Amino acid sequence: YLVNPAAYAALGAYMFLLILIGFPVNFLTLYVTIEHKKLRTPLNYILLNLAVANLFMVLGGFTTTMYTSMHGYFVLGRLGCNLEGFFATMGGEIALWSLVVLAIERWIVVCKPISNFRFTEDHAIMGLAFTWVMALSCAVPPLVGWSRYIPEGMQCSCGVDYYTRAEGFNNESFVIYMFIVHFLTPLIIISFCYGRLLCAVKEAAAAQQESETTQRAEREVSRMVVMMVISFLMCWLPYASVAWYIFCNQGSEFGPIFMTLPAFFAKSSAIYNPLIYICMNKQFRHCMI
């Protein structure tokens, strides 16, 4: 054991709790949306994509981590590490790029930079394809030799190798690529879209250009998406910051808890988005009941 055995027991219990909550709420989101025709809107396609991403993390990542934490180290070997790292990275990236597509959709619908533009089913499907392509471009390279997945923190789950300059893996270039393309770029796009969105909502309220009902509906959707973005960032910013710090200080001593806490806090994002969706979407709640 790298740390006190009680820490592994606590980790296993935490992962069990995430599975216990994460699987039903994400499955419920999928089931209710597919069952009720009126919920099958282009916007909800992206929200469904988020639920699929979360199920990736729950089924492919959380179950593995719960099992390995019972043993006190990653017992599933190289193949298991690759699979767990892939599913966790894939789920997190699909969720992040889904939030980017949602932010762009909100910007186009509310701010109307393109006159007479409607966000249709075709646009939603293109958005879905885009999220998967971007997620794969982040999760696949470590499987084929550009960086690698290794056990991290308490050695119960696997992630990208921020820790070493292992020969032949080009870890440095991959980590820089990952931070610029798969972290900073989405953050900049989301920040731009919501900056414009806030201005547009204020201007529309002042000018009373649209009916009160339309404005209220758009505000509710925008509020829900903003909450999803904030909760996602609260979960993932600590992990990204610690990973970058470790990458910039390779060779220094880091305790196993140092990376484990933010990594497992990040995993809780799999339950936040569906809960926000269920709590803040009246139409969904009515269909669920």
From Swiss-Prot:
Glycosylation sites: N171
Intervals, Cytoplasmic compartment: 33-44, 105-123, 196-223, 280-289
Superkingdom of the source species: Eukaryota
Subcellular location: Membrane; Cell projection, Cilium, Photoreceptor outer segment
Modified residues (N6-(retinylidene)lysine): K267
Membrane-topology descriptor: Multi-pass membrane protein
Key words, A-Z: Cell projection, Chromophore, Disulfide bond, G-protein coupled receptor, Glycoprotein, Lipoprotein, Membrane, Palmitate, Phosphoprotein, Photoreceptor protein, Receptor, Retinal protein, Sensory transduction, Transducer, Transmembrane, Transmembrane helix, Vision
UniProt motif ('Ionic lock' involved in activated form stabilization) ranges: 105-107
Function: Photoreceptor required for image-forming vision at low light intensity. While most salt water fish species use retinal as chromophore, most freshwater fish use 3-dehydroretinal, or a mixture of retinal and 3-dehydroretinal. Light-induced isomerization of 11-cis to all-trans retinal triggers a conformational change that activates signaling via G-proteins. Subsequent receptor phosphorylation mediates displacement of the bound G-protein alpha subunit by arrestin and terminates signaling.
Protein name in the entry: Rhodopsin
Lineage of producing organism: Eukaryota, Metazoa, Chordata, Craniata, Vertebrata
